[in-house]
Amino acid sequence: MAKAEMKMPEDFLLKISKLGSYFDSVADTVLQAGGEVVLKKVKSNLSSVIGRGTKFKSRATGELEGALGLSPSKMNRDGNHDIKVGFAEPRSDGGSNAKLANIIEYGKHGQPAKPFLKPAKTASRQECIDAMTKALDEEVGKL
């Protein structure tokens, strides 16, 4: 699975430090807002690359696209909150969605790479930051 790490600007950190005991619930809401933006871009990129440029008729079932989703916000072992865009496992045929996504992203012998995760990460970066900033401002305004 692809890993993306985004650093928060100083004004974010100042707002977050003012939240006090409400930090966890606000962090979940803010991460969810940013994750939805990235998820939407990854889904559109995945839809555009599946079945494109193949020698034979595509056998796509839509199961990979349907398995794409957002994890709940959790605290990792370093004490940072994170949220992940990824694939639900396993497939109905017993295979791995992550394996298929990896093959599509990086290719294999005889099958060229059709990246969809990395372009989504770079394309949605600013939109994600904007959505998270807006969500943070709304949550701080509620308190």
Residues covered by each model-derived region:
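Short, Lys/Arg-rich flexible segments
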Residues: 1-84, 92-93, 98-143
